[in-house]
Amino acid sequence: MASSITPRVVPAKPAGDETFDSAAYARRIIRDARTAALATTDSETGFPFLSSITTSTNRKGKVLFLTSLVASHSRNMRHDARVAVMFQIDESDEEWAAKRPMFQGRLTLSGKAHVTDDATDIEDFLKAHKKLTIAVKQDGFAIWKLDPMGVDMMAGPRLAPELSIEHLSSN
């Protein structure tokens, strides 16, 4: 059962409500996020490279994201498919999160990304981002699919469960 690719130094113990469904919360973060941070390894220097991406999920809950093929992160992923994607959703209207941005849910998936030309994936991405239809249909853009290999979720001191990739599959 794979958890984080980068194990925590100190194991995190779940805090707060024992009935809280952290797996469902993780799936919600991924599904509701419209953008995310993408970490790749620069193909020329080997240094980490971080950028923003537009995200959605397909019908199976797999992460999809759009990039311009001339962007640095696209070049990097063609050279080394290993990536990390960090999702965060705005929960500032929740009483427990008000004025505490680090209490809000954030989740990092580590894995490998590949360009998908599956018609269903493209349809699912465009359903979430209708205004990007023209960009997607141009040759200079691609939709990528993430094959996750590790997951790490933090939501401040109230919640930091150990999750596995298997937890992200909905029943």
Residue spans for each PLM region:
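C-terminal edge-of-domain segments
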Residues: 1-23, 128, 132-171
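An N-terminal domain-cap segment
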Residues: 3-4, 9-78
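Short, structured beta-strand-loop surface elements
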Residues: 9-12, 72-131, 138-141, 148-150
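Solvent-exposed, well-ordered amphipathic alpha-helical segments
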Residues: 31-36, 118, 145, 171
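Surface loops and adjacent helix of pleckstrin homology
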Residues: 41, 68, 88, 156-158
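Well-ordered beta-strand positions in beta-sheet-rich domains
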Residues: 50-52, 106-110, 162
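Residue-level recognition of conserved structural "scaffold" positions that shape functional pockets
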Residues: 53, 118, 163-165
